[in-house]
């Protein structure tokens, strides 16, 4: 089995990542064993991997969409291969991810090239690594072009927060 560690399996991005891992595992004759570390558990990579070591897995993919206290010093155990999916590269562990910063900057450039005067940003939760990088890409792109940085609307990946931000934006001249 392939072990998968998620801190929140309900977000759209994480559900898509989990689906992709499951499809790839199935195509290669593996199943997945998933461990979701909710708000009530110690939120460290070490704790997550220690839990996975107790399960019948051949390796672990840790989806690090949120900040954990031991990310920079985490070292995977010798007996269990670990790959981290994270915006930031881990110091001692193989890491993969999409370029959240670059994608955000590209979207801003594209919208401005279509004649928009500015681009507003509806951010994900402050605990999200991807949301942090996307916000920075948006901010830096506007700043480099000398454009005013409009206020950020904070969200939480849920539809209602996006709806509320949309209502607020609709009233912004």
Show which residues each predicted segment covers.
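Short helix-capping segments at alpha-helix termini
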Residues: 27-28, 142-148, 172-173
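Bulky hydrophobic/aromatic packing residues
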Residues: 30, 49-51, 112, 116-119, ...
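Alpha-helical recognition/docking segments in bacterial nutrient-uptake
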Residues: 1-109, 113, 171
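Short acidic/polar active-site loop segments enriched in Thr and Asp
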Residues: 58, 116-118, 148
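Hinge/beta->alpha junction and helix N-cap segments in small-molecule ligand-binding domains
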Residues: 6-16, 34-43, 96-106, 122-143, ...
């Amino acid at each position: 089995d392939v072990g998968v560690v998620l801190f929140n399996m309900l977000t759209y991005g994480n559900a898509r990542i989990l689906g992709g891992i499951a499809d790839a595992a199935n195509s290669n004759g593996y199943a997945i064993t998933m461990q979701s570390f909710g708000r009530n558990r110690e939120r460290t990579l070490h704790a997550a991997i220690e839990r996975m070591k107790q399960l019948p897995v051949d390796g672990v993919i840790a989806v690090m969409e949120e900040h954990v206290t031991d990310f920079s010093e985490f070292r995977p155990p010798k007996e269990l291969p670990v790959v981290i999916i994270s915006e930031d590269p881990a110091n001692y562990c193989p890491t993969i991810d999409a370029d959240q910063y670059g994608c955000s900057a590209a979207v801003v450039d594209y919208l401005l090239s279509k004649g928009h005067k500015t681009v507003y940003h509806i951010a994900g939760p402050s605990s999200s690594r991807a949301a942090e990088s996307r916000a920075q890409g948006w901010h830096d792109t506007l700043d480099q072009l000398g454009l005013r940085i409009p206020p950020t609307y904070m969200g939480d990946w849920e539809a209602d927060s996006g709806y509320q931000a949309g209502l607020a934006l609709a009233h912004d001249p």
